[in-house]
Amino acid sequence: MERVNVVGAGLAGSEAAWTLLRLGVPVRLFEMRPKRMTPAHGTDRFAEIVCSNSLGGEGETNAKGLLQAEMRRAGSLVMEAADLARVPAGGALAVDREEFSGYITERLRGHPLLEVVREEVREIPPGITVLATGPLTSEALAEALKRRFGDHFLAYYDAASPIVLYESIDLTKCFRAGRYGQSADYLNCPMTEEEYRRFHQALLEAQRHTPHDWEKLEFFEACVPVEELARRGYQTLLFGPMKPVGLVDPRTGKEPFAVVQLRQEDKAGRMWSLVGFQTGLKWPEQKRLIQMIPGLENAEIVRYGVMHRNTYLNAPRLLGETLEFREAEGLYAAGVLAGVEGYLESAATGFLAGLNAARRALGLPPVAPPEESMLGGLVRYLATANPEGFQPMYANWGLVPPVEGRMGKKEKRQAMYRRGLEAFSAWLSGLNPPLPRPEAALV
């Protein structure tokens, strides 16, 4: 059987390759790192996490929780790795990034049907191919896509939060708590009104890195840099990453005027990231601003925030709900390139693209999950959204049909969760050939 090409070994590409391998389809996995690195990556590992280490909230009231459950049912390698590399994060699924990517890399590299090619792909390969090149798609491949399909690209700039060393945090000025008395997995640095005023002003005056091109900045709303939020108004941060609602300072018995939250990044608890503080500021400015935060005056920064370009397709113009290009049989897109936002969403689209690439290789028709499932709702959005001003999408309850009947918000979401997982499970059970259990892919 001819090998299927998977271009890019991020979360989407890794999941696509794994799905193909589980169905007995040989895979040629292209990854340009380490021969050519990106501005955001630091290793040559597959599924390297370069932004937050959280795969989203868990539970039956959370849309990402439903997508997580669907992926577990599907035998996802990414979910298998996430469950093994989990670190405490309250109601969210967060991972130790080194353990996570290391596990996925070893699982894939050990499979006898996988060929790994460490080189940049500059043209669309012939044959059945999954493109999962991520937000930092190389210029050469982007140009090849434009020549093939027209100028249907959009671009915005993602930003990642700084990480500080736990032992350098002054814990006498912070308190552990989750909002509304939930699990105390977060460190909270409270600010008075005067401290916030000075911090906000410093953000407005801070120098940013100059982008590599002069295109208009189009930020995805879930990943707006903190300095951009500050520019939107004095109170914007107070209703965003610095909101104090539901956090009571035990020293005062009151909610602070503002708060900066830190979340554990690794299993050992040595590294903590500033939640919602994605930034593209120059590094000396980041250090100055972080040290204005109570408790972080002497913080040791182990990773500065970075800003990098994100390239993605105008999915409604180019892709169907099976993630196959409408004008190119046997060519699929997955992950951020396909127009989704988030680690889990990238992996989920990688699963579906890999599944349909395998079915084409086996001479079978393509499939798409039911609309009640979160993955089904997500890919239908990609295929049917308004192409004018198209923006990346992440898992949310607006992607699936509402349930009927009078019930509270919590009960309604729980009902949507149960309905979606049941529909997805039934869809999986009806696949022919069936997806082997994850253990069947072990070697």
From Swiss-Prot:
HAMAP family: TrmFO. It comes from Thermus thermophilus (strain ATCC BAA-163 / DSM 7039 / HB27). Its EC number is 2.1.1.74. Its main location: cytoplasm. Transmembrane segments: none annotated. It catalyses: uridine(54) in tRNA + (6R)-5,10-methylene-5,6,7,8-tetrahydrofolate + NADH + H(+) = 5-methyluridine(54) in tRNA + (6S)-5,6,7,8-tetrahydrofolate + NAD(+); uridine(54) in tRNA + (6R)-5,10-methylene-5,6,7,8-tetrahydrofolate + NADPH + H(+) = 5-methyluridine(54) in tRNA + (6S)-5,6,7,8-tetrahydrofolate + NADP(+). Its cofactor is FAD. Keywords: Cytoplasm, FAD, Flavoprotein, Methyltransferase, NAD, NADP, Transferase, tRNA processing. PANTHER family: GLUCOSE INHIBITED DIVISION PROTEIN A, METHYLENETETRAHYDROFOLATE--TRNA-(URACIL-5-)-METHYLTRANSFERASE TRMFO. FAD binds at residues 8-13. SUPFAM superfamilies: FAD/NAD(P)-binding domain. It comes from the Bacteria. GO terms for biological process: tRNA methylation; tRNA wobble uridine modification. It is found in: Cytoplasm. GO terms for cellular component: cytosol. The gene is trmFO. This is Methylenetetrahydrofolate--tRNA-(uracil-5-)-methyltransferase TrmFO. GO terms for molecular function: flavin adenine dinucleotide binding; tRNA (uracil(54)-C5)-methyltransferase activity, 5,10-methylenetetrahydrofolate-dependent. Gene3D superfamilies: FAD/NAD(P)-binding domain.
